């Protein structure tokens, strides 16, 4: 299956340059100017984002929220209802499976918006809380692997907003004044989850200018797919890959 992955649009809805089977969106979708305002965010998702997403040259859109998506934190169920009847699937610490016709491969996608806490942003929970959520996620993934593996080959994708600690978590943009340019600032609970879950690939955003080339963590390929730099200017192209 051909995937295309993006993150950290912050309201910039550029059309995909090439078709794919599935679009993965790793959060921070809403414009910065609307992020704290429920009425404006709701209208933007309904009138701008959903029409854009449904017009992209893909069969399925799978997405999580990010720390700027306050409306999704408060009204995720309402957004899911908005998406009913479309091919947009919104995940909040959930596992789904997708497949292609006449193909023995099935793809399990676990999506989480949870981020390492700093400041007063959306979906930021203490790491112990996150570990409990991820323990439930791991149990669900392993149960489904056991059920499905006799009949299908299973590939797994972890779609997260945050970056895991230790890989793909060093910001490279020198103009980022609050950062020393060398410290790992990823999410330790997420890194532990990856080590235990062993997905084929982790797609993330959040840290805009970390390395966009693949890095490895415990056998899992980790890729940052943010579109913008730390100044919120478009700096990267969508990431295409096959699995």
Regions found by a protein language model. Give the residues of each.
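Active-site-proximal beta-strand elements of phosphoester/diester hydrolases
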Residues: 1-10, 26, 106-118, 156-161, ...
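Core catalytic region of metal-dependent phosphoesterases/phosphodiesterases
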Residues: 6-100
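Catalytic metal-binding/acid-base residues of hydrolase active sites
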Residues: 10, 30, 67-70, 95-96, ...
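Short, Asp-centered acidic motifs that coordinate Mg2+ and/or phosphate
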Residues: 22, 155-157, 200-201
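Active-site-proximal loop/helix segment associated with metal-binding centers of metalloenzymes
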Residues: 33-37, 102-184
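Charged helix-capping and loop-helix junction motifs
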Residues: 39-49, 77-80, 126-127, 175-176, ...
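Conserved beta-sheet core of the metallophosphoesterase superfamily
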Residues: 60-64, 167-243
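Short acidic-hydrophobic surface loop/beta-edge motif
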Residues: 92-104, 212-217, 241
């Amino acid at each position: 299956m051909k995937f295309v992955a993006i993150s950290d649009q912050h309201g910039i809805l550029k059309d995909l340059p090439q078709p794919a089977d599935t679009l993965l969106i790793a959060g921070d979708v809403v414009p910065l100017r609307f992020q704290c305002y429920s009425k404006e965010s709701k209208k933007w998702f309904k009138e701008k984002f959903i029409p854009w997403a449904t017009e992209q040259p893909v069969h399925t859109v799978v997405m999580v929220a990010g720390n700027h998506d306050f409306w999704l934190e408060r009204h995720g169920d309402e957004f899911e209802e908005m998406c009913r009847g479309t091919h947009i699937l919104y995940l909040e610490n959930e596992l789904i499976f997708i497949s292609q016709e006449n193909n023995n491969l099935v793809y399990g996608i676990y999506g989480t918006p949870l981020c390492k806490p700093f400041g007063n942003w959306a979906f930021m929970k203490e790491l112990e809380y996150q570990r409990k959520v991820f323990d439930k996620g791991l149990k669900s993934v392993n149960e489904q692997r056991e059920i499905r593996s006799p009949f299908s080959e299973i590939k797994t994708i972890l779609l997260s907003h945050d970056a895991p600690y230790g890989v793909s978590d060093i910001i490279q943009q020198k103009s980022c004044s609050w950062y020393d340019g060398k410290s790992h600032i990823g999410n330790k609970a997420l890194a532990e989850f990856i080590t235990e879950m062993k997905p084929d690939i982790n797609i993330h955003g959040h840290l805009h200018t970390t390395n966009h080339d693949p890095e490895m963590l415990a056998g899992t390929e980790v890729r940052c797919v943010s579109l913008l730099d730390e100044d919120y200017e478009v700096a990267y192209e969508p990431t295409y890959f096959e699995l």
